[in-house]
Amino acid sequence: MTVRVRIAPSPTGNLHIGTARTAVFNWLFARHHGGKFILRIEDTDLERSRPEYTDNILEGLRWLGLNWDEGPFFQSQRLDLYKEAVQKLLDQGLAYRCYTTSEELEALREAQKARGEAPRYDNRHRNLTPEQRAAYEAEGRSYVIRFKIEDGREIVWNDLVRGKMSWRGSDLGGDMVIARASEEGSGQPLYNFVVVVDDIDMQITHVIRGEDHIANTAKQILLYEAMGAKIPEFSHTPLILNMEGRKLSKRDGVTSISEFQKMGFTAEGLVNYMTLLGWSPPDSTQEIFTLETAAKEFGFERVNKAGAKFDWDKLDWLNSQYIHNTPVDKLTDLLIPFWEAAGYKFDGGRDRAWLEQLVTLISQSLTRLVDAVPQSQLFFSDTVEFSEEGSTQLKQEGSTAVLEAIVTALENQPQLSEAAAQDIIKQVVKEQKVKKGLVMRSLRAALTGDVHGPDLIQSWLLLNQIGLDKSRLSRAITEAN
């Protein structure tokens, strides 16, 4: 048997972190078993589905590296298949037209609520006579198509995450609506139904999705049986929770993959983190995984039942590990869009070689890619603002003389090298009879505006290459005086 799994997002919003995590688990399971990962777009909600959301979903999956083997298939292009399946259930007497109005349903719910009962449809139109149906249609009533669910039926399956699961038919809310009214007569098929038709048609062997679909699974098993199809294996993964233990939602801030991307998370870091959101590797000390490495180890026996808390600190740490170990040329490519978005210009000598030197300088201090914007601002600005500490340092006794001596020494150094920079510092220490610390602090304050920052010599070399070191030294002397 070839393992066949699917991810089936609805294009009613951008790709959500929960959907993406489900996609990761499906992808890992498929690759672990040498199977197929199928992409299906569930766009039957015509009012809320948008092409820009579809584009966002596809782009997000590609960015994460979750390449699919088949698809994308669009449910909106498969309506004839669903309507044919609805008609078969009608012809077999397994489904029927229900003419109960919304007002009648509301009255039923209120009566059940008053009696302390759980709301459910009472199946009142299951056995209408032809005359009763004709009378309702003469009234102009619209209808839905309901699938018959027997109250006494017990639905049992072995969930690969949760073990034996059991539901009674009486707990499923009465006969299930599988289609709304339509002019063709067979109805507009709804989610719980079309999912089963698609999974049968696409020969899905394993359905991997969030635990919020457990009740749907009980209903869908009955539909598989009614359509004479083999029932797939089910795995219901834990929900993603916030740190307070509630389901992660938009109220918690960022939830879409494109937002994580804009915040400066790498695809590799985010995928690594999502892999660990609910799954524990055999080696509990291993935390860094590529998709390919995780696929070799992945299995549902190590997927947790309890909800997985979204830990921003852990995500930041993982992301920083990928940034710190990304080759300079690739990391430069990743950072350029963030610099461009900040309005930084690659002119005045800021060529590719210079950019890669800058990346080498700041890379180990980055947690997110976007951190490169503030950390490199001083290299893209003609001038810098002096912090309170920087200004204080420049006014310290001896600082002005030190800076003037550095300016004089630079007159004989049209292009500064690391060795030459070190020699200038030694020369100034000797000539001015001061400690090296004063020279270094004064030079840093002059060049960067602060007393803290990245490696001073490398910063100086970068500024020298674009002709900004001398002008900043002169301005700092003015500031000191």
Curated annotation (Swiss-Prot):
Residues reported to bind ATP: K250
GO biological process: glutamyl-tRNA aminoacylation
Subcellular location: Cytoplasm
UniProt short sequence motif 'HIGH' region, positions renumbered to this chain: 9-19
Protein EC: 6.1.1.17
Chemical reaction(s) catalysed: tRNA(Glu) + L-glutamate + ATP = L-glutamyl-tRNA(Glu) + AMP + diphosphate
KW Oxidoreductase (keyword) present: no
CDD domains in alphabetical order: GluRS_core
Gene3D superfamilies, sorted: 1.10.10.350, Glutamate-tRNA synthetase, class I, anticodon-binding domain 1, Glutamyl-trna Synthetase, Domain 2, Glutamyl-tRNA Synthetase, Domain 3, HUPs
Keyword Ribosomal protein on entry: no
Pfam families the record matches: Anticodon_2, tRNA-synt_1c
Domain of life: Bacteria
Keyword entries, A-Z: Aminoacyl-tRNA synthetase, ATP-binding, Cytoplasm, Ligase, Nucleotide-binding, Protein biosynthesis
InterPro entries for this protein: aa-tRNA-synth_I_cd-bd, aa-tRNA-synth_I_codon-bd_sub2, aa-tRNA-synth_I_CS, aa_tRNA-synth_I_cd-bd_sf, Glu-tRNA-ligase_bac/mito, Glu-tRNA-synth_I_codon-bd_sub1, Glu/Gln-tRNA-synth, Glu/Gln-tRNA-synth_Ib_cat-dom
Cellular component terms (Gene Ontology): cytosol
One term of GO molecular function: tRNA binding
Chain location of the short sequence motif 'KMSKS' region per the record: 247-251
Family: Belongs to the class-I aminoacyl-tRNA synthetase family. Glutamate--tRNA ligase type 1 subfamily.
General function of this protein: Catalyzes the attachment of glutamate to tRNA(Glu) in a two-step reaction: glutamate is first activated by ATP to form Glu-AMP and then transferred to the acceptor end of tRNA(Glu).
Oligomer and partners: Monomer.
PANTHER family assigned to the protein according to its UniProt record, in alphabetical order: GLUTAMATE--TRNA LIGASE (PTHR43311), GLUTAMATE--TRNA LIGASE, MITOCHONDRIAL-RELATED (PTHR43311:SF2)
Listed name of the protein: Glutamate--tRNA ligase
Organism of derivation: Nostoc punctiforme (strain ATCC 29133 / PCC 73102)
